[in-house]
Amino acid sequence: MAGLMSRLRAARGGDGPSGAQLHSEAGRAALFDTALSKLYKTIDQMQTKRVHLFNPIKTAEEQLQQIYLVLEAEEASIHDGMTGACLQYLLTSQRLHNIAKGLLGDQPLGARLVWLSFILQVLSHLKHPLLIHAEVLEALNSTIKVLRRDQRRLALAEANIYMQLLLRLTEYLERNPSCLPLFLEEKPQPAFPLLAALMPFVQHHTDEGKLARKAVVTCCQLANHSQQLEQFLLRHEIFAAEVAGALAGAYSNLPMSLPARSRKALKAWAYGAKAFSHRVPRAAHYFNALTFCGQVVRAVPSSVRGLILDQVYHGFMLSVLLPSLHHRAPEEAVAAMNYLRISLSRTRNTPLQGAFLRLLLASQFEGCWTLDRLVERLETLGEQSLTALSLFQALIRLHNEDVLLRLCLRFVHRPLARAAAAASRPPYPGTLMPADSGCNSEPESDIGTGTSTNTGAANHTGAGTDTSTSVHADKSNRVQLQGGTHPNGSSDVSAFALHNALEMRAGRKLLQLVPAQTAISPSERTFEGYLHAASQGVDAACAACATWRLSYLQLRPHQWLGKEDLDIDAATVNDNASAVSRCESEGLFLATLSRLTRRMLEHNLATNLLLSSIVSMLASLPVPALRNYLLDLNSPSIEGISFVEQLHALREDCLRLLAEDEGLEANLHAYRAGAEGYSRPKHRVKAPSTTAPASPARGPLATFHSSRRSRDRAASIVALPPHSAANEPGGVSTSAPTPASRASDADGASRRDARPEEPTIDDEAATTSNGGFDDGTSEQDSDSVCSSYSGSSSHRASAVSASHPSTRLTAAALATLDQERPPLPSPALGATTDTAPSVSAVGDEIKDSKRRALKVLIVQEFVKELAACAMEQSLLAVAM
């Protein structure tokens, strides 16, 4: 009560009433009547515009504050659920409505702010359910109607309190959904004034915009409890169009190309959304709009979600985002791919991610598929290639089946799966297995050579069996089957024979998996008839799979699959593998990835890090065919030099540089001695093992952290020495930071202190847009490279996933290599783009040698950790 008395005394500008007046009902009524009479008199003077010597705004504010304090004291003195006499008097005879009408006029300035502050204070602090009273609802509707009309002329303080009032109303409706029909209008046409008042402020990049976005999301959640509001959102598409328009407008305001200073500071593979927005201020507005759109899509009912996603896809992605991704200018392409990469991370595990994937997988621009255009940029030069690699790294990290199927799985799974099945089946002539024949009705006419050797059957005949005789018998049997005669002398190919063959092969398990409508009918008496029935079954299965796989894309299956007849002349695993080309191409992405791995010696270190990260993530998937394609030296799908062989080549190049320059190792020791601040003896000594730097820097390659024994075993497999820097010709300790890095950190800290205030991303974005993923950090830390689809394999993989210390070493070295300096004399290591920093502690006469020494150190660490990563992935996948 003492606090209430002091506030009342301050509001009156003098001594407050006595305690007896506030404790008694009669005293509160007298104070309330006096304040209300003075308020009416002040409003009358403002409306008639009489000449007066006092400030009417200040007087009205004092009287409203006194009324509120009396109402608060009255509520504290009565029981819960009861209405006091003063509040009951205020809610009758339209007294509250008349006060609102008098203070919502244009003149004098500040009257609206006084009324908004009073009504917000009453609704926020009084426990009585005021919204159930018609007087309060009428006053609120009048306030919303007037301020909607004059929203462009609102002062900043008025707009802020107005948004707080609307947010308070939405939160009250969320707690009491039964009051929602009171805010819905049916005549003259259906309307929801509360939502209509919020939408114009959604695109504001101020605190008012943040409050408006939060209130709109709350309104969308109310639609789950009100069928009337859900039908309103379905009938009025203007809401979905405004959500898509806000996103398109924010993206259109982004710079089409990153500034030169930002391009030098921004490494597309190392920064998240918050770090990006610090260097590109307008990016924060786009990320806020993207987060808001994702929150709305998740909050609305499922019936409204499809409408909003369709508007976003056509109104933003196809019309704005798609043309920017197909820009020919390198600077604009780099900016668009950076925006897309961070957008994918911001919308992870949300329905909006499906719309982005639909754009990448199923959209064309000027006759070119979007995904193919992005794959083509992998082989470009400079930042465009690095940004494209980082984008595909983010795509693969999503572990989306549609993306992986489009990129690689559909090109490697089918041929190698056929080969594995052919190697494990029994001899063909003894049983009838049309399902394993590869749908090849003419084995004697092979593609390219015109000859056929049944290697699959010959492998099971034994060492003393004549292969040519077995192949000839197999051909004759298949020819008899085409003519409708069984090799054992039967007159036809009956369903009984097929049943026996399948029963012998799968022990009735396969028959239990075959649907009834796809069972082979006894009327199919020829092999051609079986092929025709099997073709129809395959088409039906493909259509069903496409409907399931592309359901969130909202596409019809025939738009994706097309209508292709079954090719019965295709090559099979029984044909000559050396003379017949592969059944399917390896695909544009895998072909490009293969070419990039063959040229690892020509790339810079950053490109090799991103490339090796993509290869490691693909090799960690539980798909043996893909792992063999990427890592197995004896895989038939690999042409040319493999990825593992490139690791050996990089290793040999490092050793060659050390052997060519006799003083290189000594200069390396001198460089490290100058960096660590102590003198190293001139004679050769073994350096301590490589340790992680103290700072928790995040590297661009998320690799596996395994034990010393497992890493040594992995290194021995690829004929590399263990992970001890003492065993390296130039191995050194990396425990202390370099002077250049300390100077760079100090310079960066001073620049951060001097930087003006910039737009920030909404606080709720990190927790609501992607399930607790904070975009201020590198996206590498949120995902494990070895995560897979199955629960058991995911459990095994999670036990060994972490950021390796040498990865952080590589990241720190990359930061120093990015400084301006002359090129290195070693083109084999990509020296045209990566150079080393100058060290003031050492003389200018050995700078070139020190640069080469630092380059060798980084590549050595890269090769060792990458080899361990690749081989640990292979061993882990085999254990699965």
UniProtKB/Swiss-Prot annotation:
Extent of Low complexity compositional bias: 448-467, 687-697, 733-743, 783-805
Top-level taxon in the UniProt lineage: Eukaryota
Record field: transmembrane: none
Region spans: Disordered: 437-471, 677-805
InterPro entries to which the protein is assigned, alphabetical: FHIP (IPR019384), FHIP_C (IPR045669), FHIP_KELAA_motif (IPR045668)
Regions of compositional bias (Basic and acidic residues) in chain numbering: 744-758
Family: Belongs to the FHIP family.
Entry protein name: FHIP family protein 36947
Originating species: Monosiga brevicollis
